[in-house]
Amino acid sequence: MKRKLPVDVFSDWAINGKDVGMEKNHKLSVDNMIEFSIKKLDYFTFLDAGCGNGWVVRKVSKLNKCIKSIGIDGSQKMIEKAKSIDKKNKYYCEDLLNWKPKNKIDLVHSMEVFYYFKNPKKLIKHIYSSWLKKNSRLIIGIDYYYENKISHSWPNECGISIMSLFSEKKWKNFFFDVGFKEIKTWKVGETKKWSGTLVITGIK
């Protein structure tokens, strides 16, 4: 199988409807991350990095505390789908490594995105410097990581050309090296064969 770039694979998923399953498969982890992130917030602005069809953007926008909910994704097809479903919130088709929001954000969330970059630390640094307000939070969830052995076959199974495999410690160090404080990691949805979603978060 010829491997494709992540953005091309996800565009295919948007066309064939595979994006719908992402909400079902990731709901438990996303709910956990959002609940943790907003419990001490009053009103907040929210950005979903790698938003796909916008399901998390829509979900968070319905919360009373949320004053703005934004989605960004590199896949034109995913953004077209998000905009067709949701006329209320803003969506941008952009390269995450270069894009900057007009106004900095209180909470940046991402589920199953960062390991599709050759150098995830570069993206984490860009978000820290250009997206986040002071004392605001980045929280990410990933299923493809070293300790989750069952995930190691995914690059071949999915035919994706860029998937960067790192340990929990390495991901935590990325946040530390960039300058985040109050860094925490935990896992959601562990079973005997599945190590769960690895959550990493920190405060700017």
Residue ranges and their predicted role:
Residues 135-143:
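Conserved beta-strand signature within the Rossmann-like core of class I S-adenosyl-L-methionine
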Residues 163-178:
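Short alpha-helix
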Residues 121-134:
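A short glycine-rich, Lys/Arg-flanked "PGG" loop and its adjoining helix->strand segment in the class I
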Residues 109:
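A conserved beta-strand element that flanks and buttresses the S-adenosyl-L-methionine
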Residues 1-39, 146-147:
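Conserved class I S-adenosyl-L-methionine
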Residues 47-49, 53-98:
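Class I SAM-dependent methyltransferase SAM/SAH-binding core
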Residues 143-162:
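Short, glycine-/aromatic-enriched active-site segment of Class I SAM-dependent methyltransferases
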Residues 187-204:
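Core SAM-dependent methyltransferase catalytic element
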